[in-house]
Amino acid sequence: MHLHEYQAKDLLASYDVPIPPYWVVSSEEEGELLITKSGLDSAVVKVQVHAGGRGKHGGVIVAKSSAGILQAVAKLLGMHFTSNQTADGFLPVEKVLISPLVAIQREYYVAVIMDRKHRCPVLMLSKAGGMDIEEVAHSSPEQILTLPLTSYGHIYSYQLRQATKFMEWEGEVMHQGVQLIKKLAKCFYENDVSLLEINPLVLTLEGELLVLDSKITIDDNALYRHPNLEVLYDPSQENVRDVLAKQIGLSYIALSGNIGCIVNGAGLAMSTLDILKLHGGNAANFLDVGGGASQKQIQEAVSLVLSDESVKVLFINIFGGIMDCSVVASGLVAVMETRDQVVPTVIRLEGTNVELGKEIVQQSGIPCQFVSSMEEGARRAVELSM
């Protein structure tokens, strides 16, 4: 689960991480009230959306007067923000963050992330802050230091010495940097964070390290342990079908293809995406109905996939061990019989009650094609999608 910047800063502030003052407003009236109370005459105004690239795509405005701040608030609130990270077209801007301008001496990058290569959390540091870290990693990998942490977020003294030397922090700045890194690691571990990114971390002209921008992602599977974080979920920042899938208890991820997929089991679902790609097609979604889905959940799954207008073909790939094929068939038929236009459907059923499942579909008269293997099904689905 992604947090907005202001939510990430709220969480970091609870660990005494140094952050400049900031305010969040959701209307022009709130902006006017803030200016009146605070006397702000210069600030940076930033859209609050779950996407990067805000500065490059008009989502950040530097205002150098009170009137300029209000104009920025009016311009940004309600906009449809788009960047290279908004795959579904745009994200609505319902809130903006306002923070005073800071006199910057130098910018840094600091992050704690889960790293598959090291199979543990890692601390990443770079003196090339304020930039696209992916570009830095590609063009100048020597500018990034990666230090593996323990699974419980501990960082050793020798690693702290490595970090401060690499970042060229000395004296009081070194002390600030050490404390900051410890706090970030603690926040990461205690809140089941999968990504904690500070970009930029700045050194001010007064010699103070401050977090200017932050990004935090929480492990969805651990949210039950953090009710204080679970309530921060913002459905407006997600694909409508993603939100609906969460409500009905399905594992769904929207993709960019035109072949709708309904599969049981995450492994089989991933394999289905791969084999479609192998045959020249592209899946419109990842959807795992699991092993114990009810007929109602199957109906909801079919309706969910078909609500995507880009879907030209439906590929159902079920290997029924725990899953009952007749339940899948009944759910499919219940939805298809209510639709004016039926999407071409390719079905591969194997396992528990497979013959009964096929009989239910065939007796309904809905247009579909049964196949005997995933390979054959993928090939046929791709042909129909062209």
Swiss-Prot record:
Keyword flag Cell membrane: no
Which cofactors is this protein said to need? Answer: Mg(2+)
* Gene Ontology molecular-function annotations: ATP binding; magnesium ion binding; succinate-CoA ligase (ADP-forming) activity; succinate-CoA ligase (GDP-forming) activity
For binding Mg(2+), which residues are annotated in this chain's numbering?
Answer: 199, 213
Superkingdom of source: Bacteria
Q: Which reaction does it catalyse?
A: succinate + ATP + CoA = succinyl-CoA + ADP + phosphate; GTP + succinate + CoA = succinyl-CoA + GDP + phosphate
What the record notes about the co-factor is:
Binds 1 Mg(2+) ion per subunit.
Q: In which pathway does it act?
A: Carbohydrate metabolism; tricarboxylic acid cycle; succinate from succinyl-CoA (ligase route): step 1/1
Biological process (GO) annotations? Answer: succinyl-CoA metabolic process; tricarboxylic acid cycle
Entry similarity comment: Belongs to the succinate/malate CoA ligase beta subunit family.
**HAMAP family from the xrefs?**
Succ_CoA_beta
**Protein name in the entry:** Succinate--CoA ligase [ADP-forming] subunit beta
Query: Which organism encodes this protein?
Result: Chlamydia pneumoniae
Please name the taxonomic classification of the source: Bacteria, Pseudomonadati, Chlamydiota, Chlamydiia, Chlamydiales
